[in-house]
Amino acid sequence: QDLGVDFKLSGQAKFNQEIFDEIANKVLVAIAIIIVSTFIILMIAFRSIIIPLKAILMNILGLGATFGILVYIFQYGHFGLEAGTIVLIIPVLVFCLVFGLSMDYEVFLISRIQEEYLKGATNTKATIDGLVSTSKIITSAALIMIVITGAFAFTEVMPVKQIGVGIAIAIAIDATIIRLMLVPSFMKLFGDWNWWLPFKKG
């Protein structure tokens, strides 16, 4: 029965629900924009199709592993923590921050490899030289980020703890397994196809 009265809900709970709904509705669009823009920028920068595809794939792989570990620790309750929930905003923040940092490491490494390749080195030799010359810098930068964000793990505020642990884990995975192992392996696997661009001139 229509009573002619409008009901409106307010309060912190309603506010939180609206925020979560907005994130859930727009997160896929945001991720798509990030991935497409990253692909275009890297394709233009390195004049390659394979390099940006590989970079995006490696980032998604590392972030997927990170989210799995976060669920294992915080949602299932391990390492002395009670089972709980992961705040919805946490994966979004971790994705955006880590995706940017990981791409920074990727550009730094691939730029050095490309520099050697353009000098006339084979793809394999360029990959080895690029890795050797950048591994210490990438590892040092990653360690600084891990220490800074890892310190958040000691707070009692759960969202802050989750952000700190998530970023620290993601950077650790990216700087070791991804950047120093998988990326060079893929570079060697694809060989000269790494630098292929269908409409490249010359």
Residue ranges of model-derived segments:
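Structured non-transmembrane domains adjacent to transmembrane bundles in polytopic membrane proteins
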Residues: 1-51, 58-72, 76, 81
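Alpha-helical transmembrane segments of multi-pass membrane proteins
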Residues: 25, 29, 58, 128-140, ...
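Hydrophobic alpha-helical segments of membrane proteins
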Residues: 31, 35, 64-72, 101, ...
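Hydrophobic transmembrane alpha-helices
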Residues: 39-42, 59-60, 82-106, 147-150, ...
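Hydrophobic, glycine/alanine-rich multi-pass transmembrane helices and their short helix-loop junctions
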Residues: 39-43, 132-196
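Membrane-water interface of transmembrane alpha-helices in multipass transporters/channels
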Residues: 48-57, 76-94, 154-169
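Small-residue-enriched core segments of transmembrane alpha-helices in multipass membrane transport
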Residues: 52-73, 162-180
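Cytosolic juxtamembrane regions of multi-pass inner-membrane proteins
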Residues: 97-136, 148, 152
